[in-house]
């Protein structure tokens, strides 16, 4: 064990306040200290240049002073018996923490819920000196009659139980309001806003009308005698898409504008093209469609630009459309069941999507952050529509307060100097490091050392390792948009290394008859071009020239869909749940069911299909089992969709730039959900691991041991012949192999063949992985408490004989030689 290794990475019980934490200070060895870790975040200027050796992206640690102040006061308030709360609140708090509760709540859940209750009901002397910053509105919005509303953000790591916190606070608010209708601190109408249909469907259990099937009974959040009172409240689940005002015109683009509702005018530049579309943030119209929309009164041409040949190239237009009024929009969102009720409690799930864009112009680093320009534009459109929709609710009905829940409540861009910083209204923090120390999530293992001897190993940040090795033509100019084949030329090596480990893990998992699920491998790419080439290489065995075949059998689509490709466009189109493309809908069902072997069932054992699945399966003539059941590898652009709750991810590779620790946490977070929550004899959760290459996460304090759950014994059956049936015996020859006579001989003049030098200092064949490392130079880099594991090509090579490799090389050489113009020898002779 070296200076950074410890016998037990998980320090705390998930059900109790952390008693210890790893104290990390620049220039010092990490030490185990008593008490809870102070709340802080790591900030790096997104415009800062990466450091040498492929760059550090950790940034500077900055204390969250408001969170630490609130945390201290909540602890005192809790110790003194929650002074100031109502009788209903006190009953719920005691119910959640009672002795003998079978489904104990995680401390992370209790801490977040109690913090919000404290800020609402805490006695004034405890709240003294605590001021939560309000969100700033622009002067234009104020002149339009909008006003801000209180926001409280709880930072909770992926897998720490945000949905349960929403259920706890929904019950608290509704029951208090029902018991005292005049108390404006509480609301009996709760609007839950989420980013996509996946989360919306999963949050259906927050509806009190579900009764015994609701989260309140499944997780034992509300005593049975209070359920009738809880059912008097309303929990509304909506996608952010509903906040976009509906147009009142009908009949398509050729129809006349219906002048009903509110007129909205916008200016934009349109490029005249061969088809009507939107690409890379630009709008294209055919000449025919432009003329049609002008005739319909939808567009007014303000200016024109012609090309050298005199043809119309671009037009600046003013578009005019009529949309529903704010009153109609709010009534549509809240529905008739709510009536005219006011003082709405808002809950934003994945709240980093909901903030005010300060400027319209994009940031220089935007494409590196989101992967593709379209994805960035979609994100900022979502943020704008989401927050402006809440503004309308506040203006017409009033918002009690807004609860923001996210693992990463940060500004992602277009907010000036606030980019990469947390929301100023963050009041509670139980982040990834805390979740790791409490065992709530898997422990990521990252590259810490390889054969190159460099301070930062290449596979720690694969993108920055590859780019300097590319030629200017391969790199793709100043925008660094490399050719996919050039990326794969170097990336195939780390993929083979982790792929070999994945295959071994799949074999180990298959020995457990109680859980037939396979481990899942994820590759996150910069753009759709790289994702396409990778997918064809992995799933279809189509290797680009000069790239060896992948030879990972579990990734090939031979009759089953073992590997899928998920583009950001597919995710965005299906987020609203209203896509008209059947294949896009099917891909959404596939992605949502990765790691699930069967549908949940009702009390009589009938499968509970998600809305629309059964009809789509029948229409496409496909089986009705979960379509993601057999998926073992996902090639994606971006970080996959929020709410993706697959718990069987074991390996992740990033093939894209990472400009912030925020983005690293979002990508790695997709693989951190635990497969099991069994508590060990010491009251702590057992370790689970996810191996990660290419995602430069520098704020993880440690890694886990490789020892997982002991393999289950396989039940064996002895097969033998029955003597009385010997006359039915059938014999077969034992064939050990086949030999084919080769009459043609090919000789090679080795003297004229250039030498191939294998350089382990350039492409590392061995990599060591573990957690965070503080080196003697006093800067954050990879290491920390925990043992080191080796990642090599041993597992990848283990199942391949030398003779097989020789024939593979001969086949590749033959294919390349035959493709050359000067080759005159028929392929069959070679």
Task: Specify the residue positions occupied by each region the protein language model found.
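RecA-like P-loop NTPase motor core of helicase/translocase proteins
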Residues: 1-830
């Amino acid at each position: 064990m070296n200076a950074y290794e410890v016998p037990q990475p998980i320090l705390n019980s998930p059900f109790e306040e952390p008693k210890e934490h790893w104290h990390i200070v620049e220039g010092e060895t990490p030490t185990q200290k008593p008490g809870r870790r102070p709340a802080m975040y790591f900030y790096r200027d997104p415009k800062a240049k990466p450091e040498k050796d492929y760059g550090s992206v950790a940034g500077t640690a900055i204390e969250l002073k408001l969170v630490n102040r609130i945390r201290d006061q909540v602890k005192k308030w809790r110790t003194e018996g929650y002074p100031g709360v109502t009788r209903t609140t006190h009953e719920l708090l005691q119910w959640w923490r009672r002795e003998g509760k079978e489904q104990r709540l995680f401390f992370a859940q209790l801490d977040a819920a109690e913090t919000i209750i404290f800020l609402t009901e805490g006695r004034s002397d405890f709240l003294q000196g605590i001021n939560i910053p309000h969100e700033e509105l622009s002067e234009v919005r104020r002149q339009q009659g909008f006003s801000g509303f209180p926001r409280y953000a709880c930072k909770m790591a992926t897998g720490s139980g945000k949905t349960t916190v929403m259920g706890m606070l929904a019950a608290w608010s509704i029951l208090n309001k029902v018991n005292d209708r005049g108390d404006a601190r509480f609301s009996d109408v709760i609007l839950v806003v989420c980013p996509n249909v996946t989360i919306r469907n999963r949050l259906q259990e927050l509806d009190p009308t579900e009764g015994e099937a609701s989260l309140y009974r499944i997780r034992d959040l509300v005593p049975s005698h209070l359920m009738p009172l809880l059912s008097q409240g309303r929990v509304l689940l909506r996608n952010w898409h509903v906040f976009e005002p509906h147009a009142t015109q009908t009949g398509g683009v050729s129809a006349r504008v219906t002048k009903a509702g509110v007129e909205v005018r916008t200016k934009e530049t349109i490029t005249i093209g061969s088809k009507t579309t939107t690409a890379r943030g630009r709008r294209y119209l055919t000449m025919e469609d432009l003329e049609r929309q002008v005739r319909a009164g939808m567009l007014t041409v303000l200016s024109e630009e012609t090309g050298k040949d005199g043809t119309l190239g671009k037009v600046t237009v003013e578009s005019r459309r009529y949309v529903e009024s704010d009153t109609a929009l709010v009534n549509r969102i809240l529905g008739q069941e709510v009536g005219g009720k006011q003082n709405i409690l808002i809950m934003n799930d994945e709240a980093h999507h909901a903030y005010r864009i300060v400027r319209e112009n994009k940031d220089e680093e935007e494409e590196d952050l989101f992967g593709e320009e379209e994805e960035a534009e979609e994100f900022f459109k979502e943020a704008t529509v989401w927050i402006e929709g809440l503004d309308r609710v506040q203006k017409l009905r009033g918002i009690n307060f807004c609860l923001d829940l996210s693992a990463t409540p940060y500004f992602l861009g277009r907010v000036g100097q606030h980019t990469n910083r947390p929301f100023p209204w963050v009041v509670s923090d139980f982040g990834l490091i805390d979740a790791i120390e409490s065992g709530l999530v898997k422990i990521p293992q990252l590259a810490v050392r390889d054969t190159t001897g460099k301070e930062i190993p290449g596979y720690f940040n694969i993108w920055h390792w590859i780019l300097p090795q590319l030629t200017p033509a391969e790199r793709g100019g100043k925008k660094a948009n490399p050719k996919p084949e050039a990326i794969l030329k170097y990336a195939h090596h780390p993929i083979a290394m982790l792929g070999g480990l994945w295959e071994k893990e799949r074999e180990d998992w298959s020995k457990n008859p109680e859980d037939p699920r396979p481990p899942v491998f994820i590759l996150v790419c910069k753009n759709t071009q790289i994702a396409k080439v990778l997918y064809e290489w992995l799933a279809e065995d189509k290797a680009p020239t000069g790239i060896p075949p992948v030879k990972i059998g579990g990734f090939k689509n031979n009759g089953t869909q073992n590997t899928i490709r998920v583009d950001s466009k597919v995710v965005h189109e299906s987020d609203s749940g209203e896509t008209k493309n059947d294949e896009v809908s099917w891909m959404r069902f596939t992605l949502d069911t990765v790691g699930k072997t069967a549908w949940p069932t009702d009390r009589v054992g009938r499968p509970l299909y998600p809305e629309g699945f059964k009809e789509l399966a029948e229409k496409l003539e496909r089986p009705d089992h979960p379509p993601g059941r057999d998926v073992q590898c996902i090639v994606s652009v971006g970080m996959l969709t929020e709410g993706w709750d697959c718990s069987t991810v074991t390996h992740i590779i990033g093939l894209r730039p990472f400009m912030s620790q925020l983005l690293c946490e979002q990508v790695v977070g997709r693989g951190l959900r635990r497969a099991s929550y069994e508590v060990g004899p010491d009251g702590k959760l057992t370790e689970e691991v996810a191996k990660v290459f290419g995602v430069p996460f520098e704020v993880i304090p440690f890694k886990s041991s490789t020892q997982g759950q002991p393999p289950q014994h396989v039940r064996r059956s002895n097969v033998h012949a029955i003597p009385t049936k010997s006359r039915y015996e059938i014999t077969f020859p034992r064939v050990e192999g086949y030999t084919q006579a080769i009459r043609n001989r090919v000789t090679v003049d080795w003297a004229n063949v250039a030498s191939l030098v294998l350089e382990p200092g350039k492409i590392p064949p061995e990599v060591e992985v573990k957690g965070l490392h503080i080196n003697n130079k006093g800067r954050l880099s990879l290491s920390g408490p925990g043992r080191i594991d080796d990642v090599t090509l041993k597992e990848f090579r283990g199942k391949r004989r030398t003779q097989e490799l020789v024939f593979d090389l001969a086949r590749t050489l033959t294919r390349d030689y035959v493709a050359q113009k000067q080759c005159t020898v028929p392929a069959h002779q070679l």
